[in-house]
């Protein structure tokens, strides 16, 4: 996780996406759960302003306690990041007849899907489940939360997606080649 002032941008979705492409959605879900666990522990042990959305042990602004909804925000998107990109990748591979260029493009799009899913779903869940607390934290009216959430999606989400589009195929192609070579031996 990379701290960016008010929130923490993540790069942990990248190994989760690569892992799901190589190992399949079951192991991808496990990797995603580990991503969620790292997020939970990081936000609990070294809290930032928005950590209440990722750890039920951090008090929600304006209250003395955390919320179990933080576990939904922390784990559900991350588990899905370990599942959905595999289906995107496999679907695109079938559509493009599994040639080498298609593999790189499929990995890039799968990487983008994982990044977009993570940022989009996390911020959507914050909006729908913790909108009032987010408004309190930001010092904005509740009706301004949608714009604030879209700003995060538009900044962090774009950066995280760009990294995934570049790194998932760059690393994934090498690891997939090694996996194929080892399975032939």
Task: Show the residue positions of the predicted features.
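Loop-helix junctions at membrane interfaces
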Residues: 1-185
């Amino acid at each position: 996780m990379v701290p960016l002032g008010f929130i923490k941008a993540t790069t942990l979705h990248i190994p989760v996406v690569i892992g799901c492409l190589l190992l399949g959605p079951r192991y991808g879900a496990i990797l995603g759960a580990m991503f969620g666990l790292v997020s939970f522990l990081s936000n609990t042990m070294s809290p930032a302003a928005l950590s209440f959305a990722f750890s039920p042990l951090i008090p929600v602004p304006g209250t003395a306690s955390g919320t179990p909804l933080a576990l939904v925000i922390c784990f559900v998107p991350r588990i899905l990041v370990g599942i959905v990109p595999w289906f995107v990748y496999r679907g695109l591979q079938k559509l493009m007849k599994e040639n080498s260029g298609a593999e790189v493009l499929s990995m890039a799009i799968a990487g983008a899907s994982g990044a977009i899913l993570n940022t989009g779903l996390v911020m959507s869940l914050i909006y729908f489940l913790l909108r009032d607390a987010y408004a309190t934290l930001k010092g904005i009216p509740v009706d301004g939360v949608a714009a604030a959430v879209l700003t995060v999606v538009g900044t962090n989400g774009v950066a995280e997606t760009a990294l995934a589009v570049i790194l998932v195929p760059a690393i994934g192609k090498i690891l997939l080649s090694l996996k194929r070579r080892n399975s032939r031996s």
